[in-house]
Curated annotation (Swiss-Prot):
GO biological process: tricarboxylic acid cycle
Catalyses which reaction(s): (S)-malate + a quinone = a quinol + oxaloacetate
EC number: 1.1.5.4
Keyword annotations from UniProtKB, A to Z: FAD, Flavoprotein, Oxidoreductase, Tricarboxylic acid cycle
Molecular function per GO: 2-hydroxyglutarate dehydrogenase activity; L-malate dehydrogenase (quinone) activity
Protein name: Probable malate:quinone oxidoreductase
PANTHER family documented for this protein: L-2-HYDROXYGLUTARATE DEHYDROGENASE, MITOCHONDRIAL
Cofactor: FAD
Length: 477
């Protein structure tokens, strides 16, 4: 007899775990199945060492506030990302208050700093500060172009730096570092203890087919099948091939562009302990979002570490532990032309990736020394980061490369997939609430679910910033 579940979640990363946690909070009676092809949860892009950036709140990531023709900066994307991360904090604060989530195990206070040099970039950062600091979401943003003050904010960055060109920085002290791998495991452990979730690892999904009764039949490696009225594909780069196998019409418009990454990791613990900040610079023209250079304090499984990068690369794999055939296998008649159009129309990006692939160890050290003038090669080792699959979407103007995430859902709400990358994990709660809105709309509108949502999110139905002081106090930020 085929097992039947209320929901099947493919991929044991932060997205699927967040959706499982939300579903359980809204309906504790739901029977959930999570399928993971690897031997444990959060081993791909959710892992702290694989994630291109953590604690994204648009505090310091300059690519979220592009400069416009009149010299001002666009703020809409930064505000949306900031609100999305605040929603995550609100959810964690509620679970913390209930004693259901050990937030210190994954959440740490780390200041967020934007750092630039050169007259043009200093002027850009000043304009960004003037606009953002006037908004409630960024009211705590500090500005400085004083080298002595900057040395207090980030001593290693200023140590040994010449005075030949202007420098400036902004800082938000309420920044965070989030170990999404640890958070994923905490969510899943709690769900498994409750009996609501069955997690199967080492279990690959081969196919998805729609049955006459509206259920999905999910075929596993080995031939076993499970049935469910709802499937979520949260398998990172592996979501696109599974979405294509579902054959829903909404999948036809999409293709993927894989981008790999590498970090320089500091092997000197004493050196790493002298830097406590996420320091983001300004990306080069044509660079994908995951390649914005930053000197990044991270807490990985409780240990403080220091990373620089990521350096971009190219691989045809859709997952770090994927196959080189992932990209060619994803090509369809409907997405081949959009893929070719993106390749032809994004020459700066292609050129950037080629240059990154050609980088020597000496060139990577030079890039690091722009942030740490006294960095020595012997203190740093090169490590492979996670794999990202950016969205290629066919539209009225042909194939377009989308640098972000998108929820793709069947018209009847029976299946949803998350495609793309950046800001990703930091917006998981908001993104999974979108999945609920699109796939569980009727239940979401019921008084019972609305009451539970209001309990989980005190600001529900209003301005998420109204919960900021409460979130700060509960989470100790």
């Amino acid at each position: 007899m085929t097992d039947r579940y209320d929901a099947v979640l493919v991929g044991a990363g932060i997205m699927g775990a967040t959706l499982a946690a939300l579903l359980h909070e809204l309906d504790p009676a739901m029977r959930l199945l999570m399928l993971e092809r690897l031997d444990g949860p959060a081993l791909e892009s959710s892992a702290a060492a694989n994630n291109a950036g953590t604690g994204h709140a648009a505090n310091c990531e300059l690519n979220y506030t592009p400069q416009q023709a009149d010299g001002s900066v666009a703020t809409a994307k930064a505000l949306a990302i900031n609100a999305a991360f605040e929603r995550s904090l609100e959810f964690w604060a509620t679970l913390r208050e209930r004693g259901e989530l050990d937030t210190p195990a994954f959440l740490n206070s780390v200041p967020h700093i934007s750092f630039v040099w050169g007259q043009g970039d200093v002027a850009f950062l000043r304009q960004r500060h003037q606009q953002l600091s006037a908004l409630p979401a960024f009211a705590g943003m500090e500005w400085s172009s004083d080298p002595a003050e900057l040395a207090e904010w980030m001593p290693l960055v200023m140590q040994g730096r010449g005075a030949s060109e202007p420098v400036a920085a902004t800082r938000i002290s309420r920044g965070t570092d989030v170990d999404f791998g640890s958070l994923t495991r905490l969510y899943l452990q709690d769900l498994q203890r409750s009996g609501a979730l069955e997690l199967r690892t080492g279990c690959e999904v081969n196919d998805l087919t729609r049955k006459s009764n509206g259920d999905w039949s999910v075929e596993l490696a080995g031939g076993e099948r499970v049935q469910t009225p709802f499937v979520f594909l949260g398998a990172g780069g592996g979501a696109l091939p599974l979405l294509q196998r579902s054959t829903i019409p909404e999948a036809k418009a999409f293709a993927g562009f894989p981008v790999s990454g590498q970090w320089l990791v500091c092997g000197d613990n004493q050196l790493a302990s002298r830097h406590l900040a996420k320091v983001y610079g300004k990306a080069k023209v044509g660079a994908p979002p995951m390649s914005v250079p930053h000197l990044d304090t991270r807490f990985i499984n409780g240990e403080r570490s220091l990373l620089f990068g990521p350096f971009a690369g190219f691989s045809t794999k859709f997952l770090k532990q994927g196959s080189l055939l992932d990209l060619p296998r994803s090509v369809r008649i409907g997405n081949l032309l959009p893929m070719l159009q993106v390749g032809a129309g994004n020459f700066p990006l292609v050129q950037y990736l080629i240059n990154q692939l050609r980088q020597s160890p000496e060139q990577r050290l030079e890039a690091l020394q722009q942030f740490l003038p006294q960095a020595e090669a012997s203190d740093w080792t090169l490590s492979v980061a996670g794999q990202r699959v950016q969205i290629i979407k066919n539209g009225p103007k042909g194939g377009q490369l989308q640098l972000g995430t998108e929820v793709v859902a069947a018209a009847d709400g029976s299946l949803a997939a998350l495609l793309g990358a950046s800001p990703g994990a930091s917006t998981a709660v908001t993104t999974m609430l979108e999945v609920l809105e699109r796939c569980f709309a009727s239940r979401l509108a019921t008084p019972a679910w609305q009451e539970r949502l209001k309990a989980l999110f005190p600001s529900w139905g209003g301005d998420v910033l109204s919960s900021r002081s409460r979130n700060t106090a509960v989470l100790g930020l």
